[in-house]
């Protein structure tokens, strides 16, 4: 007959092992994914509205913008997704600021990666 200390040790070990097994399986189990999908599906999808362009386009430029079908779309993936659509006139007006912003963001990420290595 095993001693009471051995029985208690085995019982404690089996309880800890069961807790560890349940913690790992609950995170990876398909049931957990289904619960997450239900929680996400209850939220209505967010609809983004573009900002008003009041004052950004001068009245003399409106004929040029209406006739221009050229649109520029910039997309890149970093730790987050970014997408920007601009007409030709908007790109001409805000292109330098946009370029500087993108350069600052991308170089900052590159500097952080180099510092981590």
From Swiss-Prot:
Subcellular location: Secreted
Pfam family, one: Motilin_assoc
Lipidation (O-decanoyl serine): 26
InterPro entries noted in UniProt: Motilin_assoc (IPR006737), Motilin_ghrelin (IPR006738), Preproghrelin (IPR005441)
CC terms in the record's Gene Ontology section: extracellular space
Lipidation (O-octanoyl serine): 26
Gene Ontology terms: biological process: dendrite development; gastric acid secretion; negative regulation of inflammatory response; negative regulation of insulin secretion; positive regulation of cytosolic calcium ion concentration; positive regulation of growth hormone secretion; positive regulation of insulin secretion; positive regulation of response to food
Prosegment residue ranges: 52-75, 99-117
Region (Disordered): 29-52
Biased composition (Basic and acidic residues): 31-43
Protein name: Appetite-regulating hormone
Organism: Felis catus
Lineage per the UniProt record: Eukaryota, Metazoa, Chordata, Craniata, Vertebrata
């Amino acid at each position: 007959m095993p001693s009471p200390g051995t029985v208690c040790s085995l019982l404690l070990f089996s309880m800890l092992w069961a807790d560890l097994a349940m913690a790992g399986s609950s995170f990876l189990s398909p049931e957990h994914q289904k619960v997450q999908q239900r929680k996400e599906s209850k939220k209505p999808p967010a609809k983004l509205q573009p900002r008003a362009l009041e004052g950004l386009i001068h009245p003399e430029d409106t004929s040029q913008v209406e006739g221009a079908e050229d649109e520029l779309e910039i997309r890149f993936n970093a730790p987050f997704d970014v997408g920007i659509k601009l007409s030709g006139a908007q790109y001409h007006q805000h292109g330098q600021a946009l370029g500087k912003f993108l350069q600052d963001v991308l170089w900052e990420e590159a500097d952080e990666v180099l510092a981590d290595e």
